[in-house]
Amino acid sequence: MGNGLWFVGVIILGAAWGQVHDWTEQTDPWFLDGLGMDRMYWRDTNTGRLWLPNTPDPQKPPRGFLAPPDELNLTTASLPLLRWYEERFCFVLVTTAEFPRDPGQLLYIPKTYLLGRPPNASLPAPTTVEPTAQPPPAVAPLKGLLHNPTASVLLRSRAWVTFSAVPDPEALTFPRGDNVATASHPSGPRDTPPPRPPVGARRHPTTELDITHLHNASTTWLATRGLLRSPGRYVYFSPSASTWPVGIWTTGELVLGCDAALVRARYGREFMGLVISMHDSPPAEVMVVPAGQTLDRVGDPADENPPGALPGPPGGPRYRVFVLGSLTRADNGSALDALRRVGGYPEEGTNYAQFLSRAYAEFFSGDAGAEQGPRPPLFWRLTGLLATSGFAFVNAAHANGAVCLSDLLGFLAHSRALAGLAARGAAGCAADSVFFNVSVLDPTARLQLEARLQHLVAEILEREQSLALHALGYQLAFVLDSPSAYDAVAPSAAHLIDALYAEFLGGRVVTTPVVHRALFYASAVLRQPFLAGVPSAVQRERARRSLLIASALCTSDVAAATNADLRTALARADHQKTLFWLPDHFSPCAASLRFDLDESVFILDALAQATRSETPVEVLAQQTHGLASTLTRWAHYNALIRAFVPEASHRCGGQSANVEPRILVPITHNASYVVTHSPLPRGIGYKLTGVDVRRPLFLTYLTATCEGSTRDIESKRLVRTQNQRDLGLVGAVFMRYTPAGEVMSVLLVDTDNTQQQIAAGPTEGAPSVFSSDVPSTALLLFPNGTVIHLLAFDTQPVAAIAPGFLAASALGVVMITAALAGILKVLRTSVPFFWRRE
């Protein structure tokens, strides 16, 4: 290719990377395999013509910009002479896997363009001085094509011909945010640095971890060396091909994907490359480099002005952030604002926990429940915070040389939980298509850590009785994300949910943070098998029971209290000293089969329990509705219903009823009750009486059969039984609903003590979850499809008379009595003959 081309390649790579390469140079394997294929280079053996490449026609832009220069006068006759070199150009042959049948394209690229100079600029003079060896930089753009390991990928892109990854750079060039780093606050004004190991603190090997270390996880330090991936040489290639490849020292990767979205974050020393793509929005890319580094755009070589730097906010004291995307100022303003916010996250702190706390709060933001379907702006913000938390975690761990056990387990658990929420709640992913992986640990160390954690999980379940430790055991299984870990803790998790339900029926409080946390991870453990394929019969039965009990725990009062608790916690969290951890505020409603929590009656109940504040009523109502919608959206996994409640999604005649379930009650292993606002064409249907005609309720008993029928609900004061030992009510469900169409509760009758309460009827003055002061109707749903109206548990409306009205009425009676007495006295005086005796 000529000495000039070699000279340009040396200059470009020498300036960018010194004498240190972050890749291994390899010979093209096709060339080695094709040494014996020289006869195929003949284009036409009859006439003896040699193989010749195609060249672009200079008269047909835009590809004509890469045509051979006129001074070479390359023609069909002169091409075989191989006089292709021209001092001011680099020539490149681009072909496909069909080569040599596909002769390829011979392209010419101006050297001035590769050097980032104007087209008419003069080339630098050759130098005989060898470049000085320097320590490899953390980030170095690899300009040029010679020895570039991704040159073929770059050349196959359309970036130089017809495509621009950033059509509107001005839209993505924006001022720095209010909370980003400044000279006086190089880590951000709201940054709370992560804890550092005390001087002389011991670094524990993962193979020696025991339950004592779990008890003291916040003071147990693990050495970074050997635990996290050591920085390794890596070439990062922008998927949009909008900038030159970048040589970095990689430290790991975070990947989140599903059937509707893909997020990939590549971490390096002082570097992050984040790509967010969705089916419903154009892709976006964020690149973080050291403050003094610049990444140039790859553009059309025919442009009069050389491409400038990538767009983004101005550089800060530590980093410079570049933002790439096809959004323009004419596009959706909320999407552009979300991308700008994502571009500011890397400079807003160094503590991974702050970003995870903000991501949880973002999930419950005002627009979280505003609409159905994918919401790209919310997904970008959530995944931007999630990726930045990993960036902060890895950087802090390498900087401190150690990481505490609580931070390691917390980051792995919360990032996995948030990944699921972002995928299902913002991207619209099918629940069984979500995958997530954080590869920041050394592969060997990861295997050792997983083996040790698996052993600790078994030890916790065998020896410990503490609810907090059992919750930690379920969390460890959630972190391990392996079938063996889930199977090991599933029996304990199912027993815990049963125990919490017994406490709830007994009227005891089950709303402490440790209870919420235990319920969060126990529910996740029992629901997880459906992601790995078809669940076994035992797994399906456990999951169905956990879903039924979660629905029973989610009464209307609990739903309203959950809404109030979340609002209070979100208002209190400053994401600095007070963080918002969603598992500590987890509600059984989010793990239930209740999909009616965003209906108006529940919103009014939640508003009625709201404490007095200065928040305007309209804002409070919007927040309440957003939280309720998010809870409903969080719980509604269609794939989960198909896996664990298949009778509810069974198709008859190739079609399923287009009716949205409001509540599902899996009452046996193969039958469920479903509450809807419209009748279903199959199953045993009941129309609930005494309900507002504008919000009717229908109750249907479903199995896998397609027959349909209707029945009337039989009314009884109490359930009469012949056998006092076994009343036959265990397994039934007690359901209460109001005239407004609100289902207040669906309570499982799971023990003998519970069925005795139902048989005895309500006791006046004795509080019970089966009683209510609200006018309502009580039903008993049996596993065989029979439904009974329990008259004794009905609450009838009582006429409420105001005290003022009673006082006025009493005064009126007195006045009327006095008036009558006066009239009688007048009559006796005026008509004396009425009183004479004959």
Curated annotation (Swiss-Prot):
<keyword id="KW-1133">Transmembrane helix</keyword>
<feature type="glycosylation site" description="N-linked (GlcNAc...) asparagine; by host">
    <location>
        <position position="784"/>
    </location>
</feature>
<comment type="subunit">
    <text>Interacts with glycoprotein L (gL); this interaction is necessary for the correct processing and cell surface expression of gH. The heterodimer gH/gL seems to interact with gB trimers during fusion.</text>
</comment>
<dbReference type="GO" id="GO:0016020">
    <property type="term" value="C:membrane"/>
</dbReference>
<keyword id="KW-0261">Viral envelope protein</keyword>
<keyword id="KW-1043">Host membrane</keyword>
<feature type="glycosylation site" description="N-linked (GlcNAc...) asparagine; by host">
    <location>
        <position position="120"/>
    </location>
</feature>
<comment type="function">
    <text>The heterodimer glycoprotein H-glycoprotein L is required for the fusion of viral and plasma membranes leading to virus entry into the host cell. Following initial binding to host receptor, membrane fusion is mediated by the fusion machinery composed of gB and the heterodimer gH/gL. May also be involved in the fusion between the virion envelope and the outer nuclear membrane during virion morphogenesis.</text>
</comment>
<dbReference type="GO" id="GO:0046718">
    <property type="term" value="P:symbiont entry into host cell"/>
</dbReference>
<dbReference type="InterPro" id="IPR003493">
    <property type="entry name" value="Herpes_gH"/>
</dbReference>
<feature type="region of interest" description="Interaction with gL">
    <location>
        <begin position="259"/>
        <end position="323"/>
    </location>
</feature>
<dbReference type="GO" id="GO:0019031">
    <property type="term" value="C:viral envelope"/>
</dbReference>
<feature type="glycosylation site" description="N-linked (GlcNAc...) asparagine; by host">
    <location>
        <position position="73"/>
    </location>
</feature>
<keyword id="KW-1032">Host cell membrane</keyword>
<keyword id="KW-0812">Transmembrane</keyword>
<keyword id="KW-1039">Host endosome</keyword>
<dbReference type="GO" id="GO:0044175">
    <property type="term" value="C:host cell endosome membrane"/>
</dbReference>
<feature type="signal peptide">
    <location>
        <begin position="1"/>
        <end position="18"/>
    </location>
</feature>
<feature type="topological domain" description="Intravirion">
    <location>
        <begin position="825"/>
        <end position="838"/>
    </location>
</feature>
<keyword id="KW-0730">Sialic acid</keyword>
<feature type="glycosylation site" description="N-linked (GlcNAc...) asparagine; by host">
    <location>
        <position position="437"/>
    </location>
</feature>
<keyword id="KW-0732">Signal</keyword>
<keyword id="KW-1160">Virus entry into host cell</keyword>
<keyword id="KW-1162">Viral penetration into host cytoplasm</keyword>
<keyword id="KW-0325">Glycoprotein</keyword>
<dbReference type="InterPro" id="IPR038172">
    <property type="entry name" value="Herpes_glycoH_C_sf"/>
</dbReference>
<dbReference type="InterPro" id="IPR035305">
    <property type="entry name" value="Herpes_glycoH_C"/>
</dbReference>
<feature type="glycosylation site" description="N-linked (GlcNAc...) asparagine; by host">
    <location>
        <position position="332"/>
    </location>
</feature>
<dbReference type="GO" id="GO:0055036">
    <property type="term" value="C:virion membrane"/>
</dbReference>
<protein>
    <recommendedName>
        <fullName>Envelope glycoprotein H</fullName>
    </recommendedName>
</protein>
<dbReference type="GO" id="GO:0019064">
    <property type="term" value="P:fusion of virus membrane with host plasma membrane"/>
</dbReference>
<dbReference type="Pfam" id="PF02489">
    <property type="entry name" value="Herpes_glycop_H"/>
</dbReference>
<keyword id="KW-0472">Membrane</keyword>
<dbReference type="Pfam" id="PF17488">
    <property type="entry name" value="Herpes_glycoH_C"/>
</dbReference>
<dbReference type="GO" id="GO:0020002">
    <property type="term" value="C:host cell plasma membrane"/>
</dbReference>
<feature type="topological domain" description="Virion surface">
    <location>
        <begin position="19"/>
        <end position="803"/>
    </location>
</feature>
<feature type="glycosylation site" description="N-linked (GlcNAc...) asparagine; by host">
    <location>
        <position position="216"/>
    </location>
</feature>
<feature type="transmembrane region" description="Helical">
    <location>
        <begin position="804"/>
        <end position="824"/>
    </location>
</feature>
<keyword id="KW-1169">Fusion of virus membrane with host cell membrane</keyword>
<feature type="glycosylation site" description="N-linked (GlcNAc...) asparagine; by host">
    <location>
        <position position="670"/>
    </location>
</feature>
<keyword id="KW-0946">Virion</keyword>
<comment type="similarity">
    <text>Belongs to the herpesviridae glycoprotein H family.</text>
</comment>
